[in-house]
């Protein structure tokens, strides 16, 4: 019984350790934060907190559909390097992603 109790206590910790997603907000025609460092294979969750549509792309890696206010886009980075995430709709929006 004691082992079962300890196992149940550890389950939430194990679940949290597997979460490899970070949240990037799109607000005020900007990505926030504007620069991140992540591990290869990690996922970034882009949340549109503006009142208009956004989109995200990295040349040669991904190009998303348009997303309205409150919508979310999840993208992973399978290669190491430094990448610039942009928005086709708002070309001044830039996020630098360093993938280790």
Where are these regions (language model features)?
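Extracytoplasmic copper-binding redox domains, predominantly the cupredoxin/blue-copper superfamily
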Residues: 8, 15-100
């Amino acid at each position: 019984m004691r082992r079962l109790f300890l196992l149940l206590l550890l389950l939430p910790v194990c679940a949290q350790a597997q979460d490899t997603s970070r949240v990037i907000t799109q607000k005020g025609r900007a990505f926030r934060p504007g620069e991140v460092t992540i591990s290869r294979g990690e996922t970034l969750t882009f949340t549109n907190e503006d009142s208009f549509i956004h989109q995200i792309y990295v040349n040669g890696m991904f190009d998303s559909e348009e997303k309205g206010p409150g919508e979310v886009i999840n993208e992973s980075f399978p290669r190491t390097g430094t990448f610039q995430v942009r928005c086709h709709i708002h070309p001044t929006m830039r996020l630098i992603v360093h993938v280790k």
